[in-house]
Amino acid sequence: AKVTVDGAVKGWRVGHSVIVTASKKHSDVGTEERVIKGIDGRVLTLDRPLRAEHFGTGEFRSEVANLSRNVIIESADPEGVRGHTMFHRYSKGGISYARFAHLGKRGVLGRYAIHFHLAGTTMRGSAVVGAAIVDSHNRWITVHGTQYLMVRDCVGYQSVGHGYFLEDGTEVFNLLDRNLGVQAFLGRRLPDQVLPFD
């Protein structure tokens, strides 16, 4: 199958995994994961045909997102106990173009794939840029009691619960910009969680 994208694909390589999202309203079932077999300008050749119809124009046009990264953080046993990452108060640093796969502990409060936990204003200037978070059992990125964080150009694919989550709802001065979220599935309320909308 060949897919034409609307702009140059800088840094994309043969062998990278991509998703082509559904292009029908209220449909996540049309999203398909494929591997790039060739790149010719804006045309990607995929390892096998797409089964669903994907539109390149209109309100619900498909997105093509790259899930591959050079740096990979993943659980050793995705079928067993999954890992998680957490930045605490006075942490320093950020995340740039890394893949987080098979993380997040299902049904456990505070054990998310990427979690900024009660950092207040100490993370000022920190950012998560270009991350790919894949197959999380407990959200993609959670910002909890943390201010001044930038989350930009990230791809979240398959999550239980909210994908991009401001946990208290009182977090301010954070920027979530140009992120893609695909297939965030309904989860159960977490233990001791006071938020009724989860």
Predicted regions and their residues:
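Beta-strand/loop edge motif enriched in small/polar residues
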Residues: 1-148, 152-198
